Swiss-Prot record:
UVR domain: residues covered: 208-243
Protein name stated in the entry: UvrABC system protein C
Organism expressing this protein natively: Leifsonia xyli subsp. xyli (strain CTCB07)
A single GO molecular function term of this UniProt record: DNA binding
SMART domains per UniProt: GIYc (SM00465)
Domain GIY-YIG: 16-95
Known function: The UvrABC repair system catalyzes the recognition and processing of DNA lesions. UvrC both incises the 5' and 3' sides of the lesion. The N-terminal half is responsible for the 3' incision and the C-terminal half is responsible for the 5' incision.
Oligomer status and interactors: Interacts with UvrB in an incision complex.
Main localization, broad class: cytoplasm
Subcellular location: Cytoplasm
Length: 656
């Protein structure tokens, strides 16, 4: 393999100004679009020696056949052009979004002569105002039903409206007071439009203003003894308050913002958007991003912003994000432009709307208070959405079958890997060394066959892998040695095995008797070499071996100098990544429980410090690490622990 690509431009040919670049393949298809503050500095990163590039970047660069660039006047112009080209070319190596077009919205068609309210999944009506997205259609219908009591806007179809005009008879909603009846002349088109604009204003966050206005009208009607009008205003107030009650109050009344949470791993990211208007959550949007190249969180946020506000949605003045991207100022400028472009939206008084949509858009990271709590909730929802996405994907039988076939072909296996075992090692500064074994059969976890290993001594991870694989493979021999009867659950080796112990160990051996089609270790070439040594010494045959390296997601085979590259977002890589992550989780959980057990034992040996006080100490400080950092005076603040006992705890932890 050549050390660089043949189409690499000379350094002097690439300008140092801001610009946008495109990589194309032999058919001139655009593979990747990127922007740069300094084109020469950015593009030089792609033309380093291939062996030093991230694997996904290397794949893109070697797939491409040419690169071209366009110089612009500023970073902001680069951002705009990048956005335009990504939309135009849909490059496969840029972040790919799984769209959320199926979400229902509440729409008010202000662009029509007689506006109407409707629930829709399409956002194509010109001049319409959209609210949402909502997670359930019934939630919108409940809100609309309450709102029509206060703002009786037309909600019928065009056919029903024309029939009412021709017959002079209103529909049922007009008879029960949930439509003002513009079809039969009960109100003029202008009066009906004002009702629709009030509906929009309330949904946009001006709810308190309308409640105050209706309350004042109710008092005036009662003062003039027009009790029928006062009752109508009272019912309208109750309906609006009920509609407001369906939206969670999270911030002050005058706060408009969008909060974004992102949960991501090497292959995908889930995005959660909370739409807050007037201090209330007015909509929730969730979608999944397929990551092709290894993008940082800041770069991912930039792409998320472009996706979220590419349509008719006007960004609020404040947007909460997990981290600020490097070009936050330019991104804010672009969002401000989108905000001003979407002002006016079909209302009769665009100047008023422009006033509401004026001002710069600013990206922020919430540090404390209610906004930080909202941002944390968005992030938690995003992480849960990512887990749900991965779980649903892994439970898809067709996807699992394709994954087996692809893994079999990529690794040169005779049979599909219907049983896979994965091993991971965990330790804390070479202490409490443990390992995990997880089992997937037919692409699904078999938790009853998971095993945990305790490793007394080990020089490094490769030695630990060798020990664990040796112990596991010993169970596959026809006549296992005494060492193989050691429980693979962290217990110490019993030197004097009586008949009952041998029988129990034999039962455990039978549980280990099923050989894996594919044995995976968490790691690269060194770990795979250690596992291969254990496999060869065991004499066991018919077991294929592979390793998956962290971060790069490369699959290594024994004796190979180059990794096997499974396609990004493929079902095969997803399955291997999932079993690796499960092994890591299982090892970490066991390692933490060992540390907690050890520290509890150490503390329990201190005279006067019983189980209740040990529990109180750990509860007060939250973790062993925080307890170790605490001074004797801080430890003494714990209920039931005096200065003398605190000093003993401090000294004992300092000795370890």
């Amino acid at each position: 393999m050549a050390d660089t690509v043949s189409y690499r431009p000379k350094a002097g040919e690439i300008p140092t100004q801001p610009g946008v670049y495109r990589f194309r393949d032999k058919t001139r298809r655009v593979l990747y679009v990127g922007k740069a503050k300094n084109l020469r500095a950015r593009l030089s990163n792609y033309f380093q020696p291939l062996r030093s590039l991230h694997e996904r970047t290397r794949r893109m660069v070697t797939t491409a056949a040419s690169v071209e660039w366009t110089v612009v006047g500023s970073e902001f112009e680069a951002l705009q052009l990048e956005y335009t080209w990504i939309k135009e070319y849909n490059p496969p190596f840029n972040v790919q979004f799984r769209d959320d077009k199926s979400y229902p919205y509440l729409a008010v068609t202000l662009g029509e002569r007689i506006p109407r309210v409707l629930v829709t999944r399409n956002r194509i009506a010109k001049g319409a105002r959209y609210f949402g997205p909502y997670t359930k259609v019934w939630a919108i219908r409940d809100t609309v039903d309450l709102m029509l009591k206060a703002f009786p806007v037309r909600s019928c179809s065009d056919g029903v409206y024309r029939r009412a005009e021709l017959t002079g008879r209103p529909c049922l909603l007009g008879d029960i007071g949930k439509c003002a009846g513009p079809c039969v002349g009960r109100v003029t088109p202008e009066e009906h439009r004002r009702l629709a604009e009030d509906f929009v204003s309330f949904m946009a966050g001006d709810d308190s203003k309308h409640i105050r206005d209706l309350t004042e009208k109710m008092k005036q009607a009662a003062g003039t003894m027009d009790y029928e009008a006062a009752a109508r205003h009272r019912d309208a107030i109750q309906a609006l308050e009920a509609a407001m009650g369906k939206s969670a109050v999270v911030l002050q009344d005058n706060v408009d913002l969008d909060a974004f949470g992102i949960g991501h791993d090497e292959l995908a990211a889930a995005v959660q958007q909370f739409i807050v208007r007037g201090g209330r959550i007015r909509g929730v949007r969730s979608w999944v991003v397929d990551k092709e190249l290894d993008v940082e969180l800041g770069e991912l946020i930039e792409t998320v912003m472009q996706n979220a506000y590419e349509g008719a949605d006007a960004p609020p003045r404040e947007i909460l994000v997990p981290v600020l991207p490097d070009d936050a100022a330019e991104l804010g400028q672009w969002l401000t432009g989108r905000r001003h472009e979407n002002s006016g939206g079909g209302v009769s008084d665009p100047a008023a709307t422009r006033g509401r949509l004026s001002g710069r858009v600013e990206l922020k990271v919430a540090q404390r208070g209610d906004k930080a709590a909202l941002a944390q909730t968005a992030e938690m929802n995003a992480k849960n959405a990512l887990i749900l996405y991965k779980t649903r994907r892994s439970s898809d039988f067709v996807a699992r079958s394709k994954a087996f076939s692809d893994i079999q072909d990529a690794l040169g296996m005779e049979d599909a890997p219907l049983r896979m075992e994965c091993y991971d090692v965990s330790h804390l500064s070479r202490t409490n060394i443990v390992a995990s074994m997880v089992v997937f059969e037919d692409g699904l976890p078999r938790k009853d066959q998971y095993r945990r290993f305790s490793i007394p001594e080990s020089a490094d991870d490769t030695e630990s892998i060798y020990q664990v694989i040796s112990r596991r493979l010993a169970y596959l021999r026809k006549e296992p040695p005494v060492e193989a009867l050691t429980p693979a659950n962290g217990h110490d080796l019993a030197t004097d095995l009586d008949a009952e112990a041998v029988e129990a160990a034999e039962r455990r051996r039978k549980k280990f008797a099923y050989p894996p089609n594919l044995l995976i270790v968490d790691g690269g070439q060194p770990q795979v070499a250690a596992a291969r040594r254990a496999l060869e010494e065991s004499g066991v045959s018919g077991v294929h071996l592979a390793g998956i390296a962290k971060r790069l997601e490369e699959v290594w085979l024994p004796g190979s100098d180059f990794p096997v590259i499974l396609p990004r977002n493929s079902d095969a890589l997803f399955l291997i990544q999932r079993i690796r992550d499960e092994a890591h989780r299982f090892a970490i959980t066991y390692q933490r429980s060992r540390r907690k057990r050890d520290i509890t034992t150490v503390l329990g040996e201190i005279p006067g410090l019983g189980p209740a006080r040990v529990k109180e100490l750990l509860k007060h400080f939250g973790s062993v690490a925080q307890l170790r950092k605490a001074a004797p005076e801080e430890i003494a603040e714990v209920r039931g622990v005096g200065l003398r006992l605190a000093a003993a705890v401090f000294e004992r932890l300092a000795d370890r």
